[in-house]
C-alpha cells in the first residue's frame, strides 16, 4: 500500500511546493522532499516527528530548522483543519465539525471507552449512497476527502483528548470504497506514521462491486465491516438504493473471497429497524447467508432521526433476533451507539451548518 508522492522531484533553485499537503507523507517521502530543498536527509525524520508527534501546524513553527529555511517554506501546507464546532455527550463522546482548507465541513467523533480512544473518521464530504435510514446521506455529496484530511481527523481528536488514539473506524460520512486511493493512503499513514496497528483499523462499506476483491489484493490486516442491514435483495434495495446494481449474493460471494485471500474475519453490520428487518424470520434468513466462512454480526439498534419514520425495536425484539442467530451458531453481538446527545452516533453524522 503506497501513498501518493509528496512532490514531483524536479530540479529547482527555489523551495519546491509539494503537490499535496505534507500530512499523510511517509518519512521516506519527507526525506526526499527536504533534500530537494537543499536540507540534509536527517531533517526528513525531524519533520516527520514534528508533523505526527508534536502536532505542528505550520513549518514556520519547527524550531530545529533555520529561520531562513522556515521563511522560504512558510507557504508549504501541512494540511491541518480547524475545529469549527465541538459538542460533548454525557458519556464522554465528542463530535467535531472540522473546517477544511476550502471551507467544507466534515465530521469526526472521538469515543473514549476505558483505556481506549476510538476515532470515527469521515472519508467524503457528505455521502452519495443515500441510505434510507441514514442522516448523512440526506445532506447530499460534495467530494472525496484527501489523505491528509482523513489523517488530520485522528490527530485532531488525539490532541483534543490529550490521549493516544488506539483505534480508528472508517464509519463516518461517506463510502470509503468510493475513495479507495486516498483511504488506502490514509490507512498506510495511520499505521506507519501515527503508529496505530492495522488490526486496530476498521474499514466499513455498504459494498461496491469488485472493490472488496480489489481490497483483498492488498493483504491488509485491517478489519473489514460490511453494512448488510437486510437478509434479502428486495429489502436491501429498499434500505440501500445502491444495492439495486449489486445483488446481495454477489456481495456475499466477494466477502467469502476476501476471507479466503486474507484469512481475516469479516464483520457484518446490521441496523435493527422496528417492524422492517427485525423479525425472527429475518434473523433465520440472515443466518443462512453467513454459514461456511469467518464472520461476526454486529446488531445495531437504530438511532431515530427526525427526517425519517424508522424506529428502534424494543429490547425484547432485539433479544429475540439475537437469540435466533445464536441458535444458528452465528457469532453475534449487540452494539449500542455512543454519543446520542451530540448527534454523533452511527447514522447521525450530519453537518449542522448544512441544515
From Swiss-Prot:
The protein's required cofactors? [4Fe-4S] cluster
* Highest rank taxon of the organism: Bacteria
InterPro entries annotated for this entry?
Aldolase_TIM, Methyltransferase_A, RlmN_N, RNA_MTrfase_RlmN, rRNA_lsu_MTrfase_RlmN/Cfr, rSAM
**One GO cellular component term noted in the UniProt record for this chain:** cytoplasm
According to its UniProt record, which reaction does this protein catalyse? adenosine(2503) in 23S rRNA + 2 reduced [2Fe-2S]-[ferredoxin] + 2 S-adenosyl-L-methionine = 2-methyladenosine(2503) in 23S rRNA + 5'-deoxyadenosine + L-methionine + 2 oxidized [2Fe-2S]-[ferredoxin] + S-adenosyl-L-homocysteine; adenosine(37) in tRNA + 2 reduced [2Fe-2S]-[ferredoxin] + 2 S-adenosyl-L-methionine = 2-methyladenosine(37) in tRNA + 5'-deoxyadenosine + L-methionine + 2 oxidized [2Fe-2S]-[ferredoxin] + S-adenosyl-L-homocysteine
Report residues binding [4Fe-4S] cluster: 127, 131, 134
What does the note accompanying the cofactor annotation read? Binds 1 [4Fe-4S] cluster. The cluster is coordinated with 3 cysteines and an exchangeable S-adenosyl-L-methionine.
Annotated S-adenosyl-L-methionine binding lies at: 174-175, 204, 227-229, 303
Give the primary localization class: cytoplasm
* Keywords, sorted A to Z: 4Fe-4S, Cytoplasm, Disulfide bond, Iron, Iron-sulfur, Metal-binding, Methyltransferase, rRNA processing, S-adenosyl-L-methionine, Transferase, tRNA processing
| Annotated PANTHER family | 23S RRNA METHYLTRANSFERASE, RADICAL SAM CORE DOMAIN-CONTAINING PROTEIN
Question: Belongs to which family?
Answer: Belongs to the radical SAM superfamily. RlmN family.
Q: What does this protein do?
A: Specifically methylates position 2 of adenine 2503 in 23S rRNA and position 2 of adenine 37 in tRNAs.
Q: What is this protein called?
A: Probable dual-specificity RNA methyltransferase RlmN
The gene that this protein is the product of is rlmN
Amino acid at each position: 500500500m503506497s501513498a501518493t508522492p509528496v512532490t514531483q522531484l524536479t530540479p529547482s533553485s527555489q523551495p519546491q511546493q509539494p503537490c499535496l499537503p505534507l500530512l499523510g507523507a511517509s518519512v521516506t517521502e519527507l526525506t526526499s522532499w527536504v533534500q530537494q530543498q537543499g536540507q540534509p536527509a536527517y531533517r526528513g525524520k525531524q519533520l516527520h516527528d514534528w508533523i505526527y508527534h508534536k502536532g505542528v501546524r505550520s513549518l514556520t513553527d519547527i524550531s530545529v530548522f533555520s529561520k531562513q529555511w522556515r521563511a522560504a517554506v512558510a507557504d508549504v501546507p501541512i494540511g491541518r483543519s480547524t475545529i469549527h464546532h465541538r459538542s460533548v455527550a454525557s458519556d464522554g463522546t465528542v463530535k467535531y465539525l472540522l473546517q477544511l482548507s476550502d471551507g467544507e465541513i466534515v465530521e469526526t467523533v472521538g469515543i473514549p471507552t476505558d483505556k481506549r480512544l476510538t476515532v470515527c473518521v469521515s472519508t467524503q464530504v457528505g455521502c452519495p449512497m443515500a441510505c434510507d435510514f441514514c442522516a448523512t446521506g440526506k445532506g447530499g455529496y460534495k467530494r472525496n476527502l484527501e489523505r491528509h484530511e482523513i489523517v488530520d481527523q485522528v490527530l485532531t481528536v488525539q490532541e483534543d483528548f490529550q490521549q493516544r488514539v488506539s483505534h480508528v473506524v472508517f464509519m463516518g460520512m461517506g463510502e470509503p470504497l468510493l475513495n479507495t486511493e486516498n483511504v488506502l493512503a490514509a490507512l498506510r499513514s495511520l499505521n506507519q506514521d501515527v503508529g496505530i496497528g492495522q488490526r486496530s483499523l476498521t474499514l466499513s462499506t455498504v459494498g461496491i462491486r469488485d472493490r472488496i476483491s480489489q481490497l483483498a489484493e492488498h493483504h491488509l490486516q485491517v478489519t473489514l465491516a460490511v453494512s448488510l442491514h437486510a437478509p434479502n435483495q428486495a429489502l436491501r434495495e429498499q434500505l440501500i438504493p445502491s444495492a439495486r446494481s449489486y445483488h446481495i449474493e454477489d456481495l456475499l460471494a466477494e466477502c467469502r473471497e476476501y476471507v479466503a485471500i486474507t484469512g481475516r474475519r469479516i464483520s457484518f453490520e446490521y441496523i435493527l429497524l422496528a417492524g422492517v428487518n427485525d423479525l425472527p424470520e429475518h434473523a433465520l434468513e440472515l443466518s443462512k447467508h453467513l454459514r461456511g466462512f469467518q464472520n461476526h454480526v454486529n446488531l445495531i439498534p437504530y438511532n431515530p432521526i427526525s427526517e425519517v419514520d424508522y424506529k428502534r425495536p424494543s429490547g425484547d425484539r432485539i433479544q429475540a433476533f439475537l437469540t435466533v442467530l445464536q441458535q444458528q451458531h452465528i457469532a453475534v453481538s449487540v452494539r449500542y451507539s455512543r454519543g446520542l446527545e451530540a448527534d454523533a452516533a452511527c447514522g447521525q453524522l450530519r453537518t449542522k451548518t448544512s441544515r
